[in-house]
Amino acid sequence: MQSLFAPDTVVKGEDRDGDGDPDVIEIRLEVMELNGKSPDGPAVVPEYEIGPGITPGFWVFAPKTRGMTTVNFESLVANRIIRLPSPVIRIEQGDEVRIILENSHYLPHTIHFHGLDHPFKTPDGDGNDGVPLFSEHPVMPGAARTYRVQPRHAGTMFYHCHVQPHAHILMGLQGMLVVEENRPNNWVQTFNIGAGRVRSPSVAVLEGYAREYDLHYLEIDTELNNRIQRFNDPRLVSRAIHRGYNITQREPDYFVLNGRSFPYTLRESMVVVRPGQKNLIRVLNGGAEGLALHFHGHKPTVTHRDGVAVALGARVQRDVFWIASAQRIDLELNTTNDGLNAYGEGAWLLHDHREQAVTSNGIGPGGDISMVIYENFLGPRGLPQTVGGVQSLAPYFSPAYYAGEMPVFIGMGGHDLLDPDRPRSGGSKTWLFWSGVCLLALLVLIWPARWRRAR
């Protein structure tokens, strides 16, 4: 499988301290649009679904790509590295890192390294804080800027655009940035595309944890995001975003974890564990509102806040964590079944306990629902086992459900139970119709992803 990276997307240079890993790193990012207005028709391009049939507009930072932004010539679907959220970036404490923003977008942007140790100016006198007017001019369309960091402190940080931040951050120009503790032979995983499970944890993480997960939360107000679907003219887009949108009247419609809403979170962002393990979970609230993160069946412990270790005597263990906008917390999830850390194996929900956050445009279940799930509770193709079998998940993979066109209890054995529009006769025909819809959704769910995306 090709990486889709350009040859210079990540360049790892010399090992200056002789400890077996590179210490000079160069990373290139672009700015991409998702679900923007097509000049050729009503479709949005490149297409990126947060849920079944749900395609708000986004701007994202993406690794510098090669080839097409879509899956193939015949498809409108975005390729796998251009997506929400902007990629998690990992670097090592003490490394000399150059992050180059190549502005491939039609509006000016910057990168601000929120919480990351960095100088206000580079040695050459260039602005390095990403804040227009005070630090530097923004990076104009077609231009590039090199940001330089050499972090002295490890932790979970945040990067985002600082041009008109009330709009650009919430459009998706934000990502998690992790500084790993320095260790010998520590080849960190530079990008975690789509966040979720870290495939190659650092040496320091593996000293204390079996697995590591990145969780990036964001809420979406389509009154902002979908403005880019109205125009192709950058002047009109800029006016609509920067002058037409009033953030003081913000009302989110959708809530995403790692760029997806339920049920797509079940395919990408479950926290999969085994009994008796310690797992590291890094959480970023990238939204404009607070997040009440609730774990069913477990009580994790906060070990770090905003990249700073919490003293052992001050660490808090609970099942709901209030996380402010832009805040990061590191959690230790201990799956020892002792009635405190964990209650035993299962498929335990993980979600924001603000009730609107478990809906998609007011329809539930949706939003940022995910799971802490034990491997023994995984069913076919890595989805959770359910009381009704995998087919009971099928309705939620249908756009018709989130358009409000399917009965509320259809996935729960109730079919059209309590549906006021249900005919008092001919019930078998109604049941047969919705069964057919669910069967079609199930086939789409289990069919190979490549077939689904090639159009």
Task: Tell what function each PLM region has.
Residues M1-H109, D117-P119, D124-G127, F134-E136, ...:
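N-terminal, post-signal-peptide metal-ligating segments of extracellular/periplasmic oxidoreductases
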Residues G18-V24, R90-G94, M140-G142, R152, ...:
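Extracellular/periplasmic catalytic domains that process cell-envelope and extracellular macromolecules
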Residues L29, I99, I111, C161, ...:
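Divalent metal-coordination and catalytic microenvironments
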Residues L101-H105, V283-G287, N337-D338:
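Asparagine-centered strand-capping/turn motif at beta-strand->loop junctions
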Residues H105-H109, L116-F120, G127-G194, R315-G414:
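Extracellular/periplasmic metallocenter environments
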Residues V205-T301, I323, I329-L333:
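Surface-exposed interaction/gating patches
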Residues G287-E289, H294-R315, L349-Q356, I369-Y374:
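Active/binding-pocket-proximal capping segment
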Residues L440-A441:
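A cross-kingdom feature that marks long, compositionally biased intrinsically disordered regions
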